[in-house]
Amino acid sequence: MEEGEKEYMLQIQHICKEYRTGNLVQKALDDVSLNLRDNEFVAILGPSGSGKTTLLNIIGGIDSADEGNLVIDGERLADMSEKKLSLYRRKHLGYIFQMYNLIPNLTVRENIEVGAYLSDKPLDVDELLHTLGIYEHQRKLPNQLSGGQQQRTAIGRAIVKNPDILLCDEPTGALDYNTSKEILKLIETVNQKYGNTIVMVTHNDAIKDMADRVVKLRDGMIRKNYLNEHKIPAAELDW
């Protein structure tokens, strides 16, 4: 079966987005189309200002497109009621950001359980804590954790609700090299173990080597979009 004949979990169709400041107009996205499959790891790369984060925010409902459509399971998001759209974002999307945004007065376990409350199909918290390598830290508060442990907790909060799509915006940007490698290995494990589609925005060109699909943006347009035929494990990445 050809790629174009396959059914897609999410379709991004001719998305355009502009930002206006006075008389200045910046075209952030220009006719961007992209299809995502179940369990696909997609790396979106490009320089600052290329439109990477804008695209991620539109997929996640943080921002809206001026033109174009998002289609999930055959239904246009623009046609969904506000209630259904809110449920879609809350239950089917998970977010991992560069900064961890943990709730400071909740323990590691409680931060993750917040995500579980949002789902009707949550993962087992104990199993997830073991997968994340933070079971022994589950009673600690965020300020008692290292940066890597905080990011592991943030990943746990995002993944515990078992989202269809996990959106990652520079998830290792605030971490050192060794910790970054550990977090990328963890995200790879999450993708393989739980089958989520992962969309990762990054400046780190090396991450393309661990992705199933590589999308390169420049000036708001997709310049390259290809399947990675020589995928390597995160543990073998170097930069």
Could you describe each region identified by the protein language model?
Residues 10-211, 216-217:
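ABC family nucleotide-binding domain
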Residues 221-239:
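Conserved beta-strand-loop-alpha-helix hinge in the C-terminal portion
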